[in-house]
Every structure is written in structure tokens, then in C-alpha cells.
Amino acid sequence: MYTLARQLLFKLSPETSHDLSLDLIGAGGRLGLNGLLCKAPASLPVNVMGLQFPNPVGLAAGLDKNGAAIDGFAQLGFGFVEIGTVTPRPQPGNPKPRIFRLPEAEAIINRMGFNNLGVDNLLARVAAAKYKGVLGINIGKNFDTPVERAVDDYLICLDKVYAHASYVTVNVSSPNTPGLRSLQFGDSLKQLLADLATRRAELALRHGKHVPLAIKIAPDMTDEETAQVAQALIETGMDAVIATNTTLSRVGVEGMEHGDEAGGLSGAPVREKSTHTVKVLASELGGKLPIIAAGGITEGKHAAEKIAAGASLVQIYSGFIYKGPALIRESVDAIAAKR
């Protein structure tokens, strides 16, 4: 069924297709239809970050930026759902067109630029959702906030989402917000993480609960830089790392239509880079905090490879667009088969 739906959706522009798909998944969720249309994945419970997941396969941030289809995605069988990236204030993102399909490579290039309706709008949708499972909220900075003041935006978002999120992801790795990736390095990263840890401690006292903080990083760092990130995460008491965001590399898409578009490349071509980053992190972290792997999972075996590389959970986005909900079940089955 999804193969036919994809053929129809791919006749539309990528962003129109995305918006329509989100509307359909959201409507299906409100009507309780999505679970009837998709065979549920097997139960494969796992405890990560002190949270109980029914299975280790989640939705990556970016597909549902505003929390418009939380119930719909949950009904498809995801073990957890991550929404966002959300910013303190609404912003339109970059000019269109800003999403490009590369179907021959099972890849997508996007330069969306954190388009979203703002954190208050997102929280209203979270409140309206019936979903009671693990919900991650991914936070970022507004485009017009100077990078040296980025921490202000992260703290505003953390304050607002804390009571409503199972965990919070801090996005410092999108390539589409100028200067953002500089926050992954050296003293900038350590100061940001320290400020977040301090605020989280205050919020934990206020709300009477500990909400885990995850940091999402890029696949384009050297092994040494990745190792330095790992040490900073340990030193500041972060709870998890998500590896990885999209890549600026164009290896695997050279010469293809849209292959030279600006933005972050996701899908199959980023798989090896992302998995390598997972392996480096696993070596450096030594089990001190868990890794959530994202990047290039287009078949179930790729999810199992991420777990074998050292991840505790996986997330899918581009693979979901190309393969549909069946990829969730296929990934859970592949992970279970390797246990």
C-alpha cells in the first residue's frame, strides 16, 4: 500500500508531499486508523535514560516539527516520538524550495532552517495529544539570535518544555542555521552544557522530576573532535547523545540531480559516517551514557548495525519517507534477531 502512496506523493513537490503526509498521519491518528492500517512491531522493551521504551525504534526530529501528528506517528508503531526542532519564537525558515529528493540514492537534502510555529504552539499540541509514551522535544535557537547568545534560546525552550517532555534534545548540529555547529566545539560546548545542566537541576527541583538531556551532534567532525564532545558530555552530566544529524558531505550523490544543492544530506549516503560516529562515541563513552543512532537506516539490518556499533536506540526519518511504516517493524525485528 505504501509503495502506491509513495508514487502518488512523489509526484508532488517534496515540501507539499511532506505537509500532506503529515496531515494524513495526523488525521489517521485522531481517528485511530493508523494502527489498523499497519501491523504493529513486536514488543522489544528497553530501558534507556531511565525511561521505558516499548521498542528501540523512534521517529527522528524534523518530520513533525510542531507536534501536529504525535498520536498518528505513535500508532504506526514507533517506540518513541521526537518532535521539533522548536525555537522560542515562530520563524518561517529558509526560502523555498528547501527540500530535495535524490531517490536513486534514497537520500534527501534539506535546508529548512528550523521553520516552526514556536514553542508555545508546540506545547498546545502536546497537551492535546493522547499519546502517553516516550516523547522527546528537540530545541534550537532562533535564526536571528546571535550564536553567542544561543544559550538564552535553549534555556527559554528548556524552561517551557521541561514539564511536558520525557526527554529534551539540544540541537547544536543543524547545518542550516548559521554558526550553530560552532556550539559543538571546545569551550562553547562546555559552557552551553554547563548552563543547561544548572538550569535542569533547578527545574528538577521545581517540578519534582529529572528530565534527561540529549545532545544531537553532526557526522562531520574528526574522531578527535567527536572524542572531545564525548568527554564534555560526561563532565557536564548529560544523559544521552544522538548521532547524527545530516551531513555537509556529498559523497554518494555526486553528479545526481539536486546533488549539489546547499543543505544537509540525509538518508543512505550518511549511513557509514553516522555509524562511524557511533563507534567512536561508544569507545570514548565506555557505557557512561547511551547513544541514540540516527542516519541512513533504510533497511532493518541497518538498525541492527547501529545497535551493534554501540547504540541503545535508533531513529528514522529519510528511511521512513522512502520505505514507509513497514521499516519500523522491519527494524525492530532485525534488532531482536541480533539479541
Curated annotation (Swiss-Prot):
The active site is at S174. FMN binds at A61, G62, L63, D64, K65, T85, N138, N171, K216, T244, G267, G296, Y317, S318. It is an enzyme of class 1 (oxidoreductase). GO terms for cellular component: cytoplasm; plasma membrane. Binds 1 FMN per subunit. InterPro entries: Aldolase_TIM, DHO_dehydrogenase, Dihydroorotate_DH_1_2, Dihydroorotate_DH_2, Dihydroorotate_DH_cat, Dihydroorotate_DH_CS. Monomer. Belongs to the dihydroorotate dehydrogenase family. Type 2 subfamily. Catalyzes the conversion of dihydroorotate to orotate with quinone as electron acceptor. This is Dihydroorotate dehydrogenase (quinone). It comes from Pseudomonas fluorescens (strain Pf0-1).
